[in-house]
Amino acid sequence: MDITGNKATAYGFIAAAEKAGLKLYLGSYPITPATDVLHELSKHKSLGVTTVQCEDEIAGCASSVGASFAGALAVTSTSGPGICLKSEAMNLAVIMELPLVVLDVQRGGPATGLPTKSEQTDLLQALFGRNGESPMPVIAATSPTDCFESAYAASKMALELYKPFIMRKLEQMGVAQNIKRAKNLVEQEAPEVWGILDEVVK
């Protein structure tokens, strides 16, 4: 069976959501060559996947930030020009310490570029394209197999990087004596964890 990078990426997100025990949410605006991910994920509602085709790139990313806030594995997808538009909502996820996976299926060339030709032309934008020097890890896939693994790894990183804040708070509050105990409380979704989240959102 032949598999494209976009299809492998979609399956990687599904696998990560299943492993994490979370619903998968994709907020996206159709843009070549990333639209296939939206199409593929929309076929898998029975696996707890929600896809929303938004009115524009900004809404796609902002809706994913909201889904992350609600507890889903949140993903937004786009290509070169869309990353520019999503940057403010990406910054919102960073400052709120919410897990968010941003998929950039890159086009060749500047501006609208060559929509049907993929190449690695957005790397600098992916690394440094947000104001306020807000950090985001970047994973660059090189093959369909790598696309599956990269989507899975990006999802895992997004979810794991959010946990340390809660674990520190559990230690500071005296609820857990060490990081290992704090991690267990997070994984068990103990009431103390929800109390910390309530403090964050007030």
Place the predicted regions along the sequence by residue:
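Mobile "lid/hinge" segments at catalytic clefts and subdomain interfaces of large enzymes
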Residues: N91-M96, R107-P110, T142-C147, S155-R168, ...
